[in-house]
């Protein structure tokens, strides 16, 4: 079995595991007109990833019924119906409900995965 805990992002931050024990939460495919690659979330820091989302959005996500940040990321990556161009080099993945469940993602410098920057319910 592969030890995913050894995998790190381009900043050296370990990737978070999804509920299935994988670092890949979802995928961007060629049909989406973006670079095809898996979607991953790193532990990060205050500016991106899990640490950023826990600090700035975990209360909101809890109020919307999500057990934790990884559960929210998994939900959006499995159910998004809209992709919008964001600021600079980011894109928004959205599940359109009464309020948008949104993830902000950007392609890694190596272009081999999409990194979750932030997200929330807006």
Q: Where on the chain are the PLM-derived regions?
A:
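Ribonuclease/tRNase effector modules and their secretory precursors
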Residues: 1-122
């Amino acid at each position: 079995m592969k030890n995913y805990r050894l995998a790190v992002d381009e900043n050296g931050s370990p990737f978070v595991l999804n509920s299935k024990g994988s670092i890949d939460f979802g995928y961007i495919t060629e049909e989406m007109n973006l670079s095809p690659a898996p979607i991953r979330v790193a532990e990060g820091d205050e500016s991106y990833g899990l640490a950023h989302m826990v600090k700035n959005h975990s209360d909101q996500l809890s109020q919307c019924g999500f057990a934790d940040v990884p559960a929210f990321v998994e939900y959006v990556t499995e159910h998004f119906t809209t992709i919008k161009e964001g600021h600079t080099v980011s894109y928004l993945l959205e599940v359109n409900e009464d309020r948008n469940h949104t993830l902000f993602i950007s392609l890694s410098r190596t272009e081999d995965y999409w990194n979750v920057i932030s997200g929330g319910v807006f």
